[in-house]
Amino acid sequence: TILLSSLKGPFVASESTVLPFVPASVYRNDKVSGSAELNKYDVYYYSESLKTLWVYTRRAAGRITEVSPSASAPASITVAGTSYTLGSTAIASQVSSLNGGGVGQVVTLLLGMNNVAAGIITGEEADEVFYGVVQSSARNLIDEDNSADVLQTVKVLCTDGLAREVNVDKSLNFPTGWLVEVRVSPEGESVEKINQRSVSGTVNENATALGDRALADDVQILDTSTGGVAGTVR
């Protein structure tokens, strides 16, 4: 109750955002962090009385495939196969059909607590890259301009823990277990296999380094197998 009454946010950070206090505790993507750094488009909340900062860097990006409950007044949208609640009327207006948005629009959602969309990026800045492992791929018949066609959808579990579904060329093959890059640009979405690179070593006791390589404060680690089984470690 004390937390809820003192919590302020969500806010979307700009390049010049300065907090009104120095936080004693910081949580980044719900995990304890030693850095209070805010980068452009980070979603953040704070409690000045508790001297605590919460930062979220998770994003969802892709083409909108569904809006609900209506195109003119959306409360949620589906992007890359997952439905997200829109956190404010200002965000909803950006994807409303009344303003030229909606199904088919390429967006990047800035996700805050409980993966609610706290901000949205459209246009040229809606450019994101995710990495993950192919979970499955499926081809289905669709009706395209009054003729039958095949739509292939690839499901990828990414390093941020989110599963993304991307439509790709029907002639391409993406076997389960492949490591891939999912790229989202204003022109649409693409999936490409990535070349394997490796590092080795022992994780230190504070989980801040692998061998002699320091780990970023917000590093994302995905444990995978050749059979496509995967889960986030951090």
Where are each of the predicted segments found?
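...the same signal can extend to comparable exposed beta-sheet modules
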Residues: 1-234
